[in-house]
From Swiss-Prot:
Belongs to the YqgF nuclease family. Its EC number is 3.1.-.-. Pfam families: RuvX. SUPFAM superfamilies: Ribonuclease H-like. This is Putative pre-16S rRNA nuclease. It is found in: Cytoplasm.
């Protein structure tokens, strides 16, 4: 696998968390949260992020239940992934994002308690968790 830059996305109907990571260290950092309206992303902002980072691939979290059932957001996340590929002609990989938001909230709580848990930060850190999971699995 090439040792380039990758972008991770935590899709949501109101917000999409974004993270950037690299293969060399198998680590990721939260970037930002992009607003969405009823599941429709701000494609101009996504374009700017992709242009700025020039990633080799895009990683999208796929929400599922603990018992492998799909959630109401699963098909929307798949559609988002297909649109990313269609619009930007980059490889897109789906990753099981089960419990990524719980892990992100736990991380923020450790950093400063409930006052540190802001929805936008949770989304970008969840994207970070998703991307790191993919980087480690694809080694």
């Amino acid at each position: 696998m090439p040792r380039g830059v990758y972008l991770g996305f935590d899709f949501g109907y109101k917000r999409i968390g974004v993270a950037v990571g690299q293969r060399l260290t198998c680590s990721a950092s939260p970037l930002s949260t992009i607003e969405a309206k009823a599941g429709i992303p701000d494609w101009n902002t996504i374009q700017k992020v992709i242009t700025q980072w020039n990633p080799q691939a895009l990683i999208v979290g796929l929400p599922t239940c603990i018992d492998d059932r799909e959630l109401y957001t699963t098909s929307a996340a798949r559609h988002f992934a297909k649109q990313l590929h269609k619009r930007f002609s980059l490889p897109v990989h789906l990753v099981d994002e089960r419990l990524s938001t719980v892990e992100a909230r736990g991380y923020l709580f450790e950093q400063g308690g409930y006052r540190q848990i802001k929805k936008a930060e949770v989304d970008s850190i969840a994207a970070c968790v998703i991307l790191e999971q993919w980087l480690q699995q694809s080694e």
